[in-house]
């Protein structure tokens, strides 16, 4: 049995699913980073496959899902990010309207089944696209545990957030509020880890204080080191389909300070602090409040992720979704 695995960028969560599926089946990759593809080449790949598995409803999944439908082959589509979002106040999400809305809705409606990474994302695709609830299976992300037992002792007063730096993420990922909060808590070191994609880094430097460090792009090992080092992880987002970086940080023992946007409450549970909105003063106060958290609270953060989002749950969910379609 062969799966055609379709994606636009080979990011960490895509790689995880790819490897989990390869444990059981033959998987061929189809990567399309841009808008335009050769339909005949896509058609050849779909003909060879028994099932199409795609990540997000966008330009790269339009032809594979469409051809699968025409050839009466089953397809699975993972949704729950820009493709299902409608957040006009920050200009985010395909469901705001126009060509991208029509493209995403066409693709979503023609997939045989949908996978959402959170209950929030399931509700969002049902609400914004109008698909039936029973078409959507919730399969939470599985977070690989690369950290092991937490070391004893206090951590540095470091508040961490992880995001590519771009104009859209200034508001969506709460980067503006993060660096502004740093000015209100000068005794804390604020660290923004992520590649600079445009000149929005200049605005953040103007807004932030001297206690903000901008690392730029880092290796996986360097990112893991920051997770181990930080006391607090801040996710001041306006929309999150899951919040994988929060889960990774908690697995490393960071205490989360998050907004109630999207699936973030679903991820953190009763650990850390939840804020109604990305207010810099509230973020600064929350960071101060959890800085002194001891080993017991860090262990709770780690156990929350180990219990609810292990890799085995993702593996079982993907296998069940594929086998259901194959009959």
Regions found by a protein language model. Name each.
Residues 46, 217-218, 225-230:
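Short alpha-helical donor nucleotide-sugar binding micro-motif in glycosyltransferases
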Residues 95-114:
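Membrane-proximal helix-turn-helix segments that form the acceptor-binding/catalytic region
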Residues 109-135, 145:
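A short, active-site helix/loop in glycosyltransferases that binds the activated sugar's phosphate group
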Residues 151-185, 191:
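Conserved donor-binding/catalytic core segment of Leloir-type glycosyltransferases
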Residues 201-224:
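Nucleotide-activated donor-binding/catalytic signature segment of Leloir-type glycosyltransferases, i.e.
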Residues 238:
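Aromatic "clamp/platform" in nucleotide-sugar-dependent glycosyltransferases that forms part
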Residues 255-258:
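Short hydrophobic beta-strand element within catalytic cores of glycosyltransferases
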Residues 272-280, 289-294:
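Conserved acidic donor-binding segment of nucleotide-sugar-dependent glycosyltransferases
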């Amino acid at each position: 049995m062969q799966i055609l695995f379709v994606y636009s960028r080979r990011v960490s969560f895509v790689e995880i699913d790819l490897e989990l599926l390869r444990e059981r089946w033959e998987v061929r990759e189809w990567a399309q980073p841009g808008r335009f593809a050769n339909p005949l080449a896509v058609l050849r790949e779909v003909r060879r496959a028994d099932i199409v598995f795609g990540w997000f409803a966008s330009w790269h999944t339009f032809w594979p899902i469409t051809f699968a439908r025409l050839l009466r082959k089953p397809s699975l589509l993972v949704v729950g990010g820009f493709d299902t979002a409608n957040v006009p106040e920050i200009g985010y999400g395909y469901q705001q309207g126009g060509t991208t809305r029509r493209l995403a809705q066409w693709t979503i409606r023609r997939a045989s089944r949908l996978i959402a990474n959170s209950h929030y994302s399931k509700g969002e695709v049902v609400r914004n696209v109008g698909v039936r609830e029973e078409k959507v299976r919730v399969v939470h992300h599985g977070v690989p545990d690369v950290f092991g037992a937490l070391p004893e002792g206090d951590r540095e007063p470091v508040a961490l957030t992880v995001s590519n730096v771009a104009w859209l993420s200034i508001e969506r990922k709460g980067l503006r509020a993060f660096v502004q909060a740093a000015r209100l808590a000068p005794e804390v070191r604020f660290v923004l880890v992520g590649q600079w994609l445009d000149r929005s880094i200049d605005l953040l430097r103007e807004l932030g204080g001297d206690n903000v460090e901008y690392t730029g792009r880092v290796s996986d090992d360097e990112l893991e080191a920051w997770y181990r080092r930080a006391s607090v992880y801040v996710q001041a987002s306006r929309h999150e389909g899951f919040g994988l970086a929060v889960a990774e940080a908690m697995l490393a023992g960071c205490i989360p300070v998050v907004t109630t946007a999207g699936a973030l409450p679903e991820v953190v549970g009763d650990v850390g602090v939840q804020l109604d909105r990305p207010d810099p003063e509230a973020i600064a106060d929350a960071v101060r409040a959890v800085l002194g958290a001891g080993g017991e609270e860090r262990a709770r953060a780690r156990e929350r992720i180990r219990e609810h989002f292990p890799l085995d749950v993702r593996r079982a969910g993907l296998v069940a979704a594929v086998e259901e379609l194959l009959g």
